[in-house]
Amino acid sequence: KELLRSLYDNIECDHLEIDMIQMNGPAFEGVDNRILSLQLVKLGMTDAVIFTPDGVNRQAADVLYKKNILAIRGSFRPVTKVNIDMIAKGLKKFREEPKVNPDNIQVLFEITVNNLKGEGDIDEQDFLDRADILCSIGQTVLISNYQKYFKLVEFFSRHTKKRMGVIMGAATLTEIFNEKYY
């Protein structure tokens, strides 16, 4: 954490964004790069980080560029049959969209920092457990500060002009139209 903060020594946070970090080599054998990615978002150094099913941090542009993107947001504590069913049915519908190339879809399981906090600060082991479960079922994970869905879609729009979809439950859909968010 201190190393990450030191990267901003004498630099305004809004003048520099660090959107990925990867530590390799013998001196960093005990470092889980997913924790470093989480810290980037938690400390406000970037708004989103991505890691692939093999647990490797990746640049968002490398994962999302020119892709059709389908995301599901949740706490995934744990991943439930309902989550899996929602993504399966959503993906089936998304593939049927006329402008979607079914061979060019990137599915993301998004967890917001607020979903990680629960009732206090983020429990890093809990985060790793959730990430491990998602990765073990072959999913790409997005950790973000995007509380509002339109901000998430804006983030996707920086990387693709293709189709985008966000899967949500009925309660969330109703909540989106609540005036307090606008």
PLM feature spans:
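Nucleotidyltransferase catalytic core that binds NTPs
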Residues: 1-182
